[in-house]
Structure formats: C-alpha cells, structure tokens
Amino acid sequence: MNLGDRAEIRRSFTASDVAAYVELGGEPPDGRTVPEPMIAALFSYLLGVRLPGPGTNYLKQSLNFTRPAAQAEKLIASVAITRLRPEKALADLETLCRNEAGEEICVGRALVRVKDVDVAGG
C-alpha cells in the first residue's frame, strides 16, 4: 500500500435491489432514490475486498451525503489512501461517490486497521 492508491467500483441499484434491502429491515425509500446505507455499503466492499483488502478492520467512517442517488443511476464509488501510520497499522482513506455525470453523491473519510502497512509509504 502506498499514499494515493485508489480503488473503485461502478454500480447501479435497481428497484429490486432496493426492495430486497427493505425486506432486510431497511427504511422504505420514497420509491425513486437509493437508501444511503446501500451506497455506504459500496465503501465497505471496497475496503474489505480491494483496498486495503482482506483482513481490514473498519474502525471509523464519516459520510456527508450531498444529493440523493436515483434508482438505476450509475454510481462510481472510490476509496483512496490519504495517510499511512505504520507504527499503529492504520490507514486513512478518502471515500467518494459520484454519478456518471460527475455529480457528487457523498464524500467522507474512513479509518482502518490493516495487517500489512507499507512502512516506506508512511
């Protein structure tokens, strides 16, 4: 891992996806937008599977949603390493979700504990 490393996922949520979320106990949406926790889950996926990846322990997250995401709207969620603290095995990341038009859906930060922090990157 190095400062500036980045991972992204492209995804859209259908009405069926939202209905399945509501069945799990989520809040019923207004019928047109994607519930914010579904978008936040994209960051959990990226952190646990891609960057830093398996073995990551999610410690903290803050998100600011700036506009709603419409169902079926194509979203691009990304995480980028902004700080490495190898002495504590911690990594700080920027989290960002935009639509295909480049409009910001949400922005935030994440703090994770990782197995192998590159000492040279800190």
PLM regions: where:
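HotDog/MaoC-like acyl-thioester-processing domains
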Residues: 1-3, 71-74, 78-122
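Intrinsically disordered, low-complexity segments enriched in polar/charged residues with Gly/Pro
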Residues: 49-56, 68-69, 81-85
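Hot-dog-fold acyl-thioester-processing enzymes
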Residues: 1-56, 60, 119-122
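Generic hydrophobic-segment detector
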Residues: 62-63, 92
